C-alpha cells in the first residue's frame, strides 16, 4: 500500500533555494513541479524538466541536453536513510527479486514504462518539435529509457530515484520495498525537527528619514563562496567568523514595511536628534518587533545609520530603544553599512511567495556591480576590487533629507534652489569619480563596471512611480530599469509640484516621502551623469536583506 501524497504544486522561488541547500549544490535544470512536501512545507521530491538548453558561449548555438531523471529525492533525512540501505546491498536484493519473481519484474517494467511516458508528457510542444527535427537520438533517450535513464528496464540504477518515484505517488515496487524496510526499522519519511525549514528572521533599520523592517526567510547557499564570486563580502564573513564553507545565503522577503520617522530632520542645524524623531523611531521599532513576532521570526537585529552616527546625542536614542523595546540598537559605520547593502543586493532574492523555479536577482555578476545606496543623510558607493576581491566602499554626505533641509526652502522649490542643490551634488560627487569609474585602487586596477544598482527609499519610490503602483510590490520594483530620460522627466514633474500635490502622484507609495523626493531623484540623476550611465537598475534589496543574511548565518542579532 503506497502512502498518501500531496498534489503536484507549482514551485516557488524559495523552493529552488531550499532544494540546493538540501542537496548541497545547485540543482541542474528547472523544477517543473513539487509532487511531495513534508509536513513542514519543504520539498521532499521534485520533478524536473527533461530538457536543458545549454548555452555554448562565444556566439555558439544554444543546444539542448537530455535530463532523463524525472523525480529527485531531495529530503536529506530520507536520502541518508536510503544511502544506508544502498550500502547494505538493497540494489542487489532488488535486482535478484526482479530476476526470480515474475510479478515483481512485471511491476518493475510497468513502472519504467510509465516513468518514460511521464517524462515525455512534461516536454513542451516547441521543444518536442525541435527534438523530432534536430535531435532524434536525444528524443529516443528521453522516450525509451526508464527510471534514471536506464536502457534495460530490468535493471536498478539508483535506489534514491526509485524511492523518489514512489514518494511522488507512483506505483514503484523497488521504492515500495525500500520504504517498507525503513518502516520496519522504525524510520519514518520525515525528520522530527524540520531541519530544512528556512530561518525566519527580522531586520530593522532606523535611517535618517524612515525606519524599515524586513521579515525574511533565509536559506543557506552551499559552497557559494568557493565559486567564481568567492570573495564577495568576505570582510563581512570574516568579521563574523565565517570560514567560507557556508556561503552567502539567499534572503526571501515575507513582509516588508516602512514608516517615515524623520530621525535626521533638523540634525544639520542642531547636531542633535529631534525629540519627535526619536519618539517616532522608537515607536516604529517597537511596532515592527511586534509584527516580526506575529510572523514567527525568532531572531532580530536592529541598526541605525547616518543620522545616529552624526548626532551628538545618539546614546539617548540607544537608551530609549533599550528601555522601550528590550533590544540593543547598533549604530553601524558607513563602511559596514555599505557592505551590508552590497551583501543585500547579492543575497536578496525577492518574495518568498513568488512562484517560479528561478529566484529573481539583479546581481548576475557581483564583480561588475556598483551599488549606490542613497539614504536620508548619506550616499554609499560599494563595489568589488576585481584584483583583491575585497568589498570597497566610500560614503558621501549627500542625502535626500539633508539636501532638502539645506536647499529646498520653497514649496514648490524654485529653479534657483534646484540648480544650487544640483551644483552642490555634482561638487560632492567629484569625491567619488575615481571610485565610480574603477580607476586604480591601492595601485591595482579596479575593474570595469557593467551595472549600476540603486537601492534605498528614493530609488524604490521612483520605480513605483514609473510602474504606477498603488502599493509597494517588491517583486515588481526589483530589477526595474530607470532610464536617464525617464528619470529626468520624473524629476521635473516632482519638483514642479507643491508637496501636497506631490503626495498625490500615482506610485508615491509613502506620501510622507514626497517632501524629499526631488532631492532623492537629483542624487540618482547626478550619479548617472558622473558614471555616463544611460540607465540604472533598482533593487528592492539592500541593507535589510544584508542584515537578514547575517542573522541567518547566526553571526548577529538577538533572540526575539
Regions of interest found by a model, annotated:
Residues 201, 262-297, 307-368, 383-386, ...:
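Helical "lid/coupling" subdomains associated with nucleotide-phosphate turnover
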Residues 219-250, 351-364, 441-445:
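Intrinsically disordered, low-complexity terminal tails and inter-domain linkers enriched
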Residues 37-101:
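Aromatic- and glycine-enriched beta-alpha-beta binding-site module
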Residues 199-221, 248-250:
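N-terminal basic/disordered segments at the start of proteins
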Residues 78, 82-136:
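An exposed acidic His-Trp-rich patch
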